[in-house]
Amino acid sequence: MKKFEQLRGIVAPLDRANIDTDAIIPKQFLKSIKRSGFGQNLFDEWRYLDYGEPGKDAASRQLNPDFILNQSRYQGAKILVTRDNFGCGSSREHAPWALQDYGFAVIIAPSFADIFYNNCFKIGLLPIVLESPVVDRLIRDALTVDGYQLEINLEAQTVMALSGETYWFEVDHFRKHCLLNGLDEIGLTLQHADRIRKFEINRRNEQPWLFL
């Protein structure tokens, strides 16, 4: 998992509440357990005018010109700003995978579904909770200012607009540590590899009958 320290990037505003995981990545694309390849089907039913199927070349499909991510000004966006209860619905891990594979590194909303929120941290995707009036302002600015950007500082736990406005956000200390150091669950386990090996040796010596 990549370390997350600071990020400055274009903001894509998605002015909808209660976006569920089926909208983020429709069920027909959940057959793979690899984390890559889901980005082309992110928000599939909104991004395209035709029905998406696994294996269908996204380059040959008809884009919905009205959908925000299809507008040229938001190409390359790293930060998604959206509304309440983002990621609700079924607890599919593919939803944060699709967002990350598309290119998003940060999701900002007034609230998230709990399981989705937890799944984001597991892959290094940073979900940030800001108050609704602040999100209102960010969405408004992203809709009206071409190339609108934000700067995210995880160490300081701040979101800063280029105008200088700064907003502080909360993040669990342990999750912050993992993101700053690029540690997923496997990485955390490997940090204690020596202690694990020592435990196994002692256990084998003290309870040899378990290994007969």
Swiss-Prot record:
It catalyses: (2R,3S)-3-isopropylmalate = (2S)-2-isopropylmalate. InterPro entries: 3-IsopropMal_deHydase_ssu (IPR004431), Aconitase/3IPM_dehydase_swvl (IPR015928), AconitaseA/IPMdHydase_ssu_swvl (IPR000573), IPMI_Swivel (IPR033940), LeuD (IPR050075). GO terms for biological process: L-leucine biosynthetic process. Disulfide bonds: none annotated. The keyword Amino-acid biosynthesis applies. Its EC number is 4.2.1.33. One of its GO terms (cellular component) is 3-isopropylmalate dehydratase complex. It is an enzyme of class 4 (lyase). Keywords: Amino-acid biosynthesis, Branched-chain amino acid biosynthesis, Leucine biosynthesis, Lyase. GO terms for molecular function: 3-isopropylmalate dehydratase activity. It holds the Pfam family Aconitase_C. Pathway: Amino-acid biosynthesis; L-leucine biosynthesis; L-leucine from 3-methyl-2-oxobutanoate: step 2/4. CDD domains: IPMI_Swivel. Belongs to the LeuD family. LeuD type 1 subfamily. Heterodimer of LeuC and LeuD. Catalyzes the isomerization between 2-isopropylmalate and 3-isopropylmalate, via the formation of 2-isopropylmaleate. NCBIfam families: leuD, PRK01641.1. This is 3-isopropylmalate dehydratase small subunit.
